[in-house]
Amino acid sequence: MAKKIDAYIKLQVKAGQANPSPPVGPALGQRGVNIMEFCKAFNAQTQGLEPGLPIPVVITVYSDRSFTFITKTPPASILLKKAAGITSGSATPNTNKVGKVTRAQLEEIAKTKMPDLTAADLDAAVRSIAGSARSMGLEVEGV
């Protein structure tokens, strides 16, 4: 018989840097989950990724206080900011452009994000990421 699910916890934790301090500790502690066990497992799973890159994680907590977790791909906005070499998006994206991204950069980001996107093919994923880039105030070349 399947275990009874007690809760889902959604967090963004930096790759390889999970520790018991907030936000991880309080979110897991109030559900009775072993915090250090999660931190060790998460850090082991994300050690191949760029350190410090925020990784969304969905933790499923069961009624017997055990857990499983699924890591997602980094947010598109973080990847776009890194590709454009900027620290933040534009406050007025329609009038003030803060950087440029090329189609090649968008394709690279789309390939990274593909498992989490609902796009049918790579071209649709590129258009989706291009829309995110435009809403951040980035100039999109070649799309």
Curated annotation (Swiss-Prot):
What Pfam families does this protein map onto? Ribosomal_L11 (PF00298), Ribosomal_L11_N (PF03946)
Which GO molecular-function terms appear in the entry? large ribosomal subunit rRNA binding; structural constituent of ribosome
Q: Which GO terms describe its biological process?
A: translation
Enumerate the InterPro entries for this protein.
Ribosomal_uL11, Ribosomal_uL11_bac-typ, Ribosomal_uL11_C, Ribosomal_uL11_C_sf, Ribosomal_uL11_CS, Ribosomal_uL11_N, Ribosomal_uL11_N_sf
Record bears the keyword Ribosomal protein: yes
The chain's coiled-coil residues are: none
Superkingdom of origin: Bacteria
Oxidoreductase as UniProt keyword: no
Q: Which CDD domains match?
A: Ribosomal_L11
What are the entry keywords? Methylation, Ribonucleoprotein, Ribosomal protein, RNA-binding, rRNA-binding
One GO cellular component assignment for this chain's record is: cytosolic large ribosomal subunit
Q: How does it assemble?
A: Part of the ribosomal stalk of the 50S ribosomal subunit. Interacts with L10 and the large rRNA to form the base of the stalk. L10 forms an elongated spine to which L12 dimers bind in a sequential fashion forming a multimeric L10(L12)X complex.
Purpose of the protein? Forms part of the ribosomal stalk which helps the ribosome interact with GTP-bound translation factors.
**Family per similarity comment:** Belongs to the universal ribosomal protein uL11 family.
* Name this protein carries in UniProt: Large ribosomal subunit protein uL11
Species this chain originates from: Thioalkalivibrio sulfidiphilus (strain HL-EbGR7)
